[in-house]
Amino acid sequence: MNKLIVYNTPSWLTAFTTGKGSGVEALGFQLEELALPRQVHSDNVLWMHEAGRPEATDAVITDQPGLPVCVKTADCIPVLLYDTRQRIVAAVHAGWRGTVSRIVQKTVRQMHPLDPKDLHAIIGPGISLQQFEVGDEVYEAFFAAGFPMERIARRFPSSNGKEAWHIDLWDANRFLLQELGVDDIFVEGTCTRTSGDFYSARRETINTGRNYNGIVIKMKSEE
């Protein structure tokens, strides 16, 4: 199996997600050529102008052609952003902690869009509402952070026979983008826990591989 998604985007950029049996090499990149942060479930956002592995960062932004900004996931939600007017791109790692901390909004603000209508978002494969069972403390964290719980949370029967909360991380991040006036939001919709095409920490343990999610501004010669 060689799972690679290349998203439908303007001709001046490439946005992608790699799954099992694939990698950034399929797109002509080497790992050492990426702007790829060492993620810690933070809300830290960093502008990058060259390849590297910055510490304790979960979102990266660039305006440099030829520099892929990437995040790794294995159930968490990847959000890829691009500004069509300024030609700025970003990759965001949004697990539940990052989502509660509104990391996608902090990333958008650091991109300094002239108009939110210029911003476009791709929400890639991640764990679905049906599969993302959480404890009451996670539900309370989203509630305290001002999320619309009637929209993003549901109760489903759990394996112990009781009901448990489930959170829709895709829609939680869509809500955050909509709050800032971003309208063009594409949700890819594949659940990593149920799809064998992608790595899943909940299905395969935390030591499984990782899906790479990236976006790159093409060099002028490639457009």
Predicted regions and their residues:
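Active-site microenvironment for binding and transforming phosphate-containing groups
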Residues: 1-223
